[in-house]
A protein has these predicted regions:
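C-terminal alpha-helical interaction appendages
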Residues: 1-149
Length: 149
């Protein structure tokens, strides 16, 4: 068994959940085994402490998941994907969205520079709406100039 596959099979529930989340949303930490293990261990500790404090399993799980995903709710990829999916369904076919977003992401990376995507409440802030609008404009300009490649 290769090292990567072995490391995956050794991950806890929280580690596997986090790895899936990081990969699905294209976070750079997806390749950082130490980061994943530390976060997973911390989430397990939060769960255990919450249970010792007499919280119900559901409440303990909620606290553990919050600790696991702290600062990892919003990725550049997932926000841009949402923009393309929601605002450009006629221009970019569903089967082309992932490739289109992957192509476009480095071109619009500077748009994200003034926003704190690690804020777990970012989606409820006016900044989220502003970022969404800026990305929508950037995508529209790209499509107008280059089409959908």
């Amino acid at each position: 068994m290769n090292r990567k596959k072995q490391a995956q099979t050794e991950l806890s529930y929280y580690g596997l959940y986090l790895l899936h989340h990081l990969r699905e949303n294209r976070f750079p930490q997806a390749n950082d085994a130490d980061f994943i293990r530390e976060r997973a261990d911390h989430a397990a500790e939060v769960y255990e402490q919450a249970r010792r404090d007499a919280l119900f399993a559901d409440a303990a799980q909620e606290l553990a998941m919050a600790a696991l995903l702290k600062g990892l709710r919003f990725s550049k990829y997932s926000i841009l994907y949402d923009v393309v999916d929601s605002e450009f369904p006629l221009e970019v076919a569903v089967e082309d969205q992932e490739a289109f977003v992957n192509h476009l992401l480095p071109l619009v990376d500077n748009v994200y520079s003034i926003y704190d995507l690690t804020d777990d409440n970012f989606a409820q802030s006016p900044d989220y709406d502003q970022l969404y609008t800026e990305l929508t404009g950037a995508v529209a300009l790209f499509i107008e100039s280059n089409g959908v490649q």
